[in-house]
Swiss-Prot record:
Catalyzed chemical reaction(s): L-glutamyl-tRNA(Gln) + L-glutamine + ATP + H2O = L-glutaminyl-tRNA(Gln) + L-glutamate + ADP + phosphate + H(+)
HAMAP family per UniProt: GatA (MF_00120)
Taxonomy, superkingdom: Bacteria
InterPro entries, per the entry: Amidase, Amidase_CS, Amidase_dom, AS_sf, GatA
Name of the protein: Glutamyl-tRNA(Gln) amidotransferase subunit A
Gene from which the chain derives: gatA
GO molecular function: ATP binding; glutaminyl-tRNA synthase (glutamine-hydrolyzing) activity
Active-site annotation: 78, 153, 177
A biological-process GO annotation: translation
Entry annotated with the keyword Protein biosynthesis: yes
EC primary class: ligase
Length: 485
């Protein structure tokens, strides 16, 4: 039995009782990485020397009264979250040798909580993708079946947890990039409310949509991690100065009287029968615990995919303009003049999907098209947000599938961008509205790959979605299933 089959609270107790050491946890992580990483390919950079040195320091503090629950816990960090002195590439050749000079706020908070960073995790380049096949280095595979994708863009973050390489990880979610891979890999992934977690030190893709969040084996562990990284940050003007509650207090298993909304759009056209049936079965479980549900409508969700790609690509076009060989990124040697420097650096440094998004965004922002595309997309975004607010006036949570289908095979959709983009039709509306959502395991498809249940909450009401997710988790055994890699 792996140490990582235990929860954070169980490991914390074992540490305090000196049944195990922090070094044991770190070595467990690196041993597992040595065993499976050649197949999974979840990591881009390992932090072995520093991690072992920190473990030795923390071993001397075991048993101290001020040791928090995350003391000594091994974590993986998505490679678009900067880590001082530890290579951060965004899975792009553009940043292949970038060593940050500061820590992201979330990394700083976890360091203060005495977690240990095991390494940096693979992803779709600059977080643009749904399968991890867009990494500029190599594709991560799904631990449940290496022929399948782990999802994206936080595919490395989800795969590392599912494979038992780390206890938990950090990902980022712009249109579903935490929840979708969590669903595909059979783990728990939360996208917090926009502004709940500081984005300082997150390499920007789409600044009005990006959020950092936790990926874990269980809901309880997820709540511990969010508790540690949440809060206002003076380094991020978009972080919200709203009190962070106690997310653990509501994990009672009680959902009696809870009002659940189920959008008909989330169970209709484009959603596979397996995903639909798994959600209906989950609703039956929650009904048996005293919750009630009704069908509702989110009428503008059908426009979410187009709206998202116009807004996110426009913001990416602006954000990625800094990678030009002068300010950031590699510099092409194949230059005769300044224009060659810009053009060749970006042509050689960016992958195809990043170039596609930049071109789309530049077009949407260009003179003569701004009003017709970008401005119109922002107006539709407001309508989508209003749909959520109207539903939440009468219901506590919204529930549906995380993804339309289970994971698909490597190479199956990479040459068809529109089919690939459609994997996120159920997660994208949440980002556009800025509300929180969690994915928890809720079943398996005919291909024996995991399915995820998405629970969506009101702004800054992560506590309620944790309560529902935990109650469902405790009433079922899906979270106990492990990839057999």
């Amino acid at each position: 039995m792996s140490l990582f089959d235990h929860s954070v609270s169980e490991l914390h107790k074992k540490l305090n009782n000196k049944e195990i050491s922090v070094t044991d946890l770190v070595e467990e992580s690196y041993k597992r990485i040595a065993d499976v990483e050649d197949n999974v390919k979840a990591f881009l950079t390992l932090n072995e020397e520093n991690a072992r040195a920190k473990a030795k320091e923390l071993d001397a503090k075991i048993g101290a009264e001020d040791n928090g629950l995350l003391f000594g816990m091994p974590i993986g960090v998505k490679d678009n979250i900067v880590t001082k002195g530890l290579r951060t590439t965004c899975a792009s050749k553009m940043l292949a040798n970038f060593d940050p000079i500061y820590d992201a706020t979330v990394v700083q908070k976890l360091n203060e909580a005495d977690t240990i960073t095991i390494g940096k995790l693979n992803m779709d380049e600059f977080a643009m993708g749904s399968s991890n096949e867009n990494s500029g280095f190599y594709a991560t595979k799904n631990p449940w079946n290496l022929e399948y994708v782990p999802g994206g863009s936080s595919g490395g973050s989800a795969a590392a947890v599912a494979a038992g390489e780390v206890l938990f990880s950090l990902g980022s979610d712009t249109g579903g990039s935490i929840r979708q891979p969590a669903a595909y890999c059979g783990v728990v992934g939360l996208k917090p409310t926009y502004g709940r977690v500081s984005r300082y030190g997150l390499v920007a893709f789409a600044s009005s949509l990006d959020q950092i969040g936790p990926i874990t084996r269980t809901v309880e562990d997820n709540a511990y991690l969010l508790q540690a990284i949440s809060g206002v940050d003076r380094m991020d003007a978009t972080s919200a100065n709203i009190e962070v509650g106690n997310y653990l207090a509501g994990l009672t298993g009680d959902v009696k009287g809870l009002r659940i909304a189920v959008p008909k759009e989330y169970l209709g056209e484009g959603v596979g029968e397996e995903a639909r049936e798994s959600v209906l079965a989950a609703l039956k479980v929650l009904e048996g615990m005293g919750a009630t549900w009704e069908e509702v409508s989110l009428p503008h969700s059908k426009y979410a995919l187009a709206t998202y790609y116009l807004i996110s690509s426009s913001e990416a076009s602006s954000n990625l303009s800094r990678f030009d060989g002068v300010r950031y990124g590699v510099r092409s040697d194949n230059v005769n003049n300044l224009m060659d420097l810009y053009k060749n650096t970006r042509s050689e440094g960016f992958g195809d999907e990043v170039k596609r998004r930049i071109m789309l965004g530049t077009f949407a922002l260009s003179s003569g098209y701004y009003d017709a595309y970008y401005k119109k997309a922002q107006q539709v975004r407001t309508l989508i947000k209003n749909d959520f607010e109207n539903v939440f006036a009468n219901y506590d949570v919204i529930i549906g599938p995380t993804t339309p289908t289970p994971a698909f095979k490597v190479g199956e959709k990479i040459d068809d961008p529109m089919t690939m983009y459609a994997n996120d039709i159920l997660t994208i509306p949440v980002n556009l509205a800025g509300v929180p959502a969690i994915s928890v395991p809720c079943g398996f498809g005919a291909n024996n790959m995991p399915l995820g249940l998405q629970i969506i909450g009101k702004h800054f009401d992560e506590a309620t979605i944790y309560r529902v997710a935990h109650a469902f988790e405790q009433a079922t055994d899906y979270h106990t299933k492990k990839a057999s890699l």
